Amino acid sequence: MHQEIQSEVVIIGSGPAGYSAAFRCADLGLETVLIEHQERLGGVCLNVGCIPSKSLLHIAKIIKDASELSESGVFFNKPIIDIKKINNWKEKIIKKLTTGLSNMGEKRKVRIVQGKALFNTDHSVLVKNKKNDFTIFFKHAIIATGSKPIKIPSLPNEDNRIWNSTDALSLKSIPNRFLIIGGGIIGLEMATIYSALGSKVDIVDRFNAFLPSVDKDITDIYIKSIKKRFKLLLNTHVKSVEKSKDNDLIVKIAEENSDENVCCYDNILVAIGRSPNVDFLGLEKIGLKLNESGFIEINQQLKTNISHIYAIGDVTGFPMLAHKAVQQAHIAAEVISGKKHYFEPKVIPSVAYTDPEIAWVGLSEKEAENNDIDYEVSLFPWSASGRAHASNCTLGMTKLIFNKNTNKIIGGSIIGTNASELISEIGLAIEMGSDAEDISLTIHPHPTLSESISLASEVFQGTITDLLNLKKSLLN
């Protein structure tokens, strides 16, 4: 059956970008249609990404923490892993959140249409599902179709033992020997999960620099922390994957300027990045422009080259982060409603939800150097934090970068427990143009990990009393 729908705004995709845009449009009084080809709202993030990965990382951390408590005089037996129960628990979390989204959409009177969207014209889309097809006419459209995992064409991808991130998060099995190709955030998080569950994990990454966006003094702490849990092989790549007579996956691994190694694995995860989901939309038909990397070109109001069609989230390029997407969604909806708003954040924080966590925001040292900024680094090691000692998490550090001419904070990074929860203070300080004195004179509760931020500012100020004050002779 064919139906025609008229709407002020149509949004394609219901991940964090799409549902946020739809709900904001509805709140602003705009008649809104939200198109989603999956059965549930929430996109990759809620269903097969951010949320399920954090639930499994939570389990992994508890397993690790419990094993370390023996040093404090508390002993636990070796954990029993019940995959079925873990998956049921994970599914309950996802279902609760997706149901909540559907309820919020219904209460806002957002019309939800299930199916894949294809642009007919620059003012209409065709949507088909198993039962119906729709032509939806719109004044404005927002493309929020997200991204998909990149495959390695040379691998036997038809083999169901070669996984992408969605497969890994479905927790089909716990491989004894697990190879992860790609040492980025996704690969590291999966290594954290599966090593805690009992897998012997190797990570290979073809690049020489580990997490190149993060300063080396931070990543060195992380590399030190993982040595007993899994192996990280940099400057290394997979040459081939074959099946043995015993049906193992035989992998040839080559390090640059070194001999090949042949290893056997039960499963392989390919985590080399993601690409935008734009192939099925028919964008070429309406003349909507993509850049050289295949992402949709936008301006600061999230408009494409077709001024009434907007794009937000992963389809617009790096950083491909849900929190960036949500902010873009709000701006796009507000621009459509007539507000003169722009997407122009000073900084966007990034987090690797590993153990320990790594979080960073603003400029790194290398970026400050490349921008010819006269900067100074201020460090507070968590080995000097009372809360870190009490919580058994002294392997950590808070690092701030200040402009020496203005004393303003321009960047920061944290490695350690709950770094993801701490980094926002640094982001806010940069957005507000705060200087070191603003941060150091803001009284932080004690004992906390968050006070490491004010203490790092005190190091820069030369007022620190929790460490030896190396600047005192300069300030007298």
From Swiss-Prot:
Keywords: Cytoplasm, Disulfide bond, FAD, Flavoprotein, NAD, Oxidoreductase, Redox-active center. Its cofactor is FAD. Disulfide bonds join C45-C50. GO terms for biological process: 2-oxoglutarate metabolic process. It is found in: Cytoplasm. It is an enzyme of class 1 (oxidoreductase). GO terms for molecular function: dihydrolipoyl dehydrogenase (NADH) activity; flavin adenine dinucleotide binding. Its EC number is 1.8.1.4. It catalyses: N(6)-[(R)-dihydrolipoyl]-L-lysyl-[protein] + NAD(+) = N(6)-[(R)-lipoyl]-L-lysyl-[protein] + NADH + H(+). The active site is at H446 (proton acceptor). GO terms for cellular component: cytoplasm. Its main location: cytoplasm. The active site is a redox-active disulfide bond. Homodimer. This is Dihydrolipoyl dehydrogenase. It comes from Buchnera aphidicola subsp. Schizaphis graminum (strain Sg).
